Swiss-Prot record:
E.C. number(s) listed in UniProt: 3.4.13.21
Pfam families: Peptidase_S51
Domain of life from the UniProt record: Bacteria
Active site, per annotation: 123 (charge relay system), 138 (charge relay system), 160 (charge relay system)
GO biological process: one example: proteolysis
Localization (cell): Cytoplasm
Molecular functions (GO terms): dipeptidase activity; serine-type peptidase activity
Keyword Transmembrane: no
Protein name: Peptidase E
């Protein structure tokens, strides 16, 4: 059974790193205590892989699991193949996807998750689980071989969604950017995840977790809203 937890962000309001996600992760991974999580740190542009791994190990120590970054493997896919759970951290989605292709991890992650290995990711790690990364918010832009992502979730994801414009900001709002995307890609669906929200995916069903409803935008910016604790098919 496909089992994924897609988190909008690593923090919510004034909480510590991944602190608000711990109750969800403890429930999500209740049967995996003592098992191994393969962690993919590629999105962390401003820190080393070792630093990112240590940050996540400290934040998730209460899970009682062994968190190992893929960069410790002779081949990075070795760590993925041996792991009980797969996790991808947030940061820069372009850098993340580029290195997933470079290290030949796309197919092995897709295969394992489709065959029941639990997957969780936040921010870029949620974005890359979708159909493509074409609704990322990120800079700098590096060029992966394709914008097609893991396609574990068949639609677009936009993490860190904030509605409207900040005072003094004269550029496009997030809604305006997504409307432009849907003009160019009219058959797409975009799931917008506000801060502090998450989707728990089980096969073709999704449950909304967190503090804010999740939005789904389609052609002409038709908007569906999925309230907290709602379960829906996608």
């Amino acid at each position: 059974m496909k089992n994924m937890l897609l988190l909008s962000s690593s923090k919510y309001k004034n909480t510590g790193y991944l602190e608000h996600t711990l109750p969800w992760l403890q429930n999500f991974l209740a049967d995996y205590r003592g098992k191994t999580i393969a962690f993919v740190p590629y999105a962390g542009v401003s820190r080393t892989f070792d630093e990112y791994e240590k940050t996540v190990q400290n934040a998730l120590s209460d899970l009682g699991m062994n968190i190992v970054s893929v960069h410790h493997g002779k081949q990075h896919r070795d760590i993925i193949e041996q792991a009980d759970v797969i996790s991808i951290g947030g940061g820069n989605t372009f850098c993340l996807l580029k290195q997933l292709y470079e290290h030949n991890l796309i197919d092995i992650i897709r295969e394992k998750v489709n065959n029941g290995t639990p997957y969780f990711g936040w921010s870029a790690g949620a974005n890359v689980a979708g159909a493509s990364i074409m609704t990322t918010n990120d800079m700098p832009i590096t060029y992966p071989p394709s914008f097609q992502a893991l396609q574990l979730f068949p639609h677009q994801i936009n993490p860190h969604f904030i509605s409207g414009k900040m005072q003094g900001h004269n550029g496009e709002s997030r809604e305006e950017r997504l409307a432009e995307f849907l003009l160019v890609n009219p058959t797409a669906l975009v799931y917008a995840l506000p801060e502090g929200s998450a989707l728990h995916i089980q096969n073709e069903m999704a449950t909304v977790l967190g503090e804010n409803p999740i939005l789904c935008f389609s052609e002409n910016m038709e908007c569906g809203t999925f309230d907290i604790n709602t379960t829906f098919s996608y």
